Structure formats: structure tokens, C-alpha cells
Amino acid sequence: MAIAFKSGVFFLQSPKSQIGFRHSSPPDSSLSFKRFTPMASLSTSSPTLGLADTFTQLKKQGKVAFIPYITAGDPDLSTTAEALKVLDACGSDIIELGVPYSDPLADGPVIQAAATRSLERGTNLDSILEMLDKVVPQISCPISLFTYYNPILKRGLGKFMSSIRAVGVQGLVVPDVPLEETEMLRKEALNNDIELVLLTTPTTPTERMKLIVDASEGFIYLVSSIGVTGARSSVSGKVQSLLKDIKEATDKPVAVGFGISKPEHVKQIAGWGADGVIVGSAMVKLLGDAKSPTEGLKELEKLTKSLKSALL
């Protein structure tokens, strides 16, 4: 299967029947969420700002948003809960939480492997929501879910939106739905106060990009390169001109993601005028490669601090 960039989001060039979301026996609901305390003090206040409002506040302070991504349930949901606290305590402004899916065609090998491990442990949407219901009140930054469309369809658009909002989720990214097919998604998101973030890419024509930025809520997700997610050695110089084009079309904040893994990447993108920087595979790899969950969380803290400091 190939991924084409259509309408500024990922359009899967594959048969319409997709591999279904794997449902395994639900994990033990008595999850422990108190295993690890980072060196930075943990916040215990509920998020009060949504995505767009977070960017507005940061802009007033002359700051750029740091947005890390991790996969829910890798290596397990208890560790995910602790990771969310660590990311929040280390100064993350928004956190993207990936819902594992069996056919994640927009993702590179690191996040694909994390999704596979998570699904094999029995992670599903219900267990993720149960975890978030307990953890969101303990953190101060908003959570945005990153999920493929299949899990949403399985639950039903309205029920999905209401259930994620009920546990405190503020934003949503659905990478495999082209713009023309987002109308119902946007309607249900609006009805449930969920900010639906849309993506634009280096191959998106200017006129289509303008339609995307007009429809996007929360912020504009600028994909920095063609292809799947994954750390890269450098950031494409095209990002600077893409940012300029988008900012000429909208006043909405723009965050850049895909391939960003180092403090120098973060600093460079911020210098080009991005309102936010998204880092995913580097975070996921640390948690996946660690010898133990505690080691992974400590390494996650170190990386988060180094990336965040590049924006200060």
C-alpha cells in the first residue's frame, strides 16, 4: 500500500476495506499510576485551556509550543500514564497521544512497532479512555488524540467524540481522512468542543492548503516532509517557505511535525516562525528501547528537557 498526499492529509491508496482495529481482552483495570516521579514536580491541576487558547497564551509570552507525541500502551498503559505526567512536568505545552492501530500507514517503523506492541498487550480505546480519565486531572496541559479513522467509525462519530471529551481530551488529529470527507467529523467535533486539527504537506497545492487551514481548529499541522513519520538527520529547508505561505493565508497557529528529533531541529523550526514543534518518533523510541519502564521514563524526561530548553 502507498500513501499519497491528497487534500493536505494522508489519503490511503488501498482497498476501502481496512484491517479492523484489533480487540483483545481488556487489560486489568486496576492500573497503577504512581510508579515514577520525575525530578520536575508533577502538576495536579486540570487543564483549563484548549489547543488554540494554549497557542494564544504562548504567543502573548513570545513562546513556541513544545508538543511531544507518545503511543498509548507502549510498553503498557501504566507507563503511558506516568509518561504523560513526566511530559507535563517538564514543560510540554500540548501532548499528542497516539491510539494504536493495526495498519498505521502514515507512521514509520518506530511508531508502527510501538502500536504493534501496544495492541499485543490488549490496549484498546476503552482502556486508553479509562487511563486518561484518571490521569488528565493530574496534568496541566491539553491532550490531543492522534488516531486513524477506523477506531472512530467502530465506535460511531458522535459516541467517539463525546467519550473522548468526557475524559478531558481537547484535540484530535485523524491523518487518514482527506479534507472532502471531514465534514461530519468536524460537525461532531464542534458539537463536543473537540478541536479537530487538519494537516497540510509539502505537496499540498496552495488553494487546497487555504481550504485546509480555514477548516482546521486548534492549529495547523504542517508535515515537514513527504513520507511517513520518523526521525531524520535534518529538517527540509522547504519548511521555511511553507510556513511563510501558510501564515500569509491564516492567522491560526502552525505547528511543524514529522522527522523532528533533536534540539537543533526544534530551534531551527522555531526560528523559521513556527508556533509549535511536534516531536514523536524520538520519544516513542526511548520508551520502546528502554530496559525497563523506569529507565524509559527517566530518559524521556532528559530528552524532553533538552528539547524544551531549545525553545527557551
UniProtKB/Swiss-Prot annotation:
The Gene Ontology biological process terms listed for this entry are: auxin biosynthetic process; defense response by callose deposition in cell wall; defense response to bacterium; gravitropism; L-tryptophan biosynthetic process
Q: Which reaction does it catalyse?
A: (1S,2R)-1-C-(indol-3-yl)glycerol 3-phosphate + L-serine = D-glyceraldehyde 3-phosphate + L-tryptophan + H2O; (1S,2R)-1-C-(indol-3-yl)glycerol 3-phosphate = indole + D-glyceraldehyde 3-phosphate
Q: Which InterPro entries match?
A: Aldolase_TIM, RibuloseP-bd_barrel, Trp_synthase_alpha_AS, Trp_synthase_suA
Q: Which CDD domains match?
A: Tryptophan_synthase_alpha
For the null mutant, the annotation states:
Compressed root wave phenotype on tilted agar surfaces. Reduced accumulation of tryptophan, but increased levels of auxin.
> What Enzyme Commission number(s) does the record list for this chain?
4.2.1.20, 4.1.2.8
Q: Which UniProt keywords apply?
A: Amino-acid biosynthesis, Aromatic amino acid biosynthesis, Auxin biosynthesis, Chloroplast, Lyase, Plastid, Transit peptide, Tryptophan biosynthesis
**Molecular-function GO term, any one:** indole-3-glycerol-phosphate lyase activity
Q: Name one GO cellular component term.
A: chloroplast
Free-text tissue specificity from the UniProt record: Mostly expressed in roots, hypocotyls and leaves, and, to a lower extent, in seedlings, cotyledons, stems, inflorescences, flowers, siliques and seeds.
Question: In which domain of life is the source organism classified?
Answer: Eukaryota
Catalytic residues in the record: E96 (proton acceptor), D107 (proton acceptor)
Task: State its location(s).
Answer: Plastid, Chloroplast stroma
Pathway annotation from the record: Amino-acid biosynthesis; L-tryptophan biosynthesis; L-tryptophan from chorismate: step 5/5
Stated family: Belongs to the TrpA family.
Summary of subunit composition and partner proteins: Tetramer of two alpha and two beta chains.
Know the name of this protein? Answer: Tryptophan synthase alpha chain, chloroplastic
Q: Which organism is it from?
A: Arabidopsis thaliana (Mouse-ear cress)
Q: What is the lineage of its organism?
A: Eukaryota, Viridiplantae, Streptophyta, Embryophyta, Tracheophyta
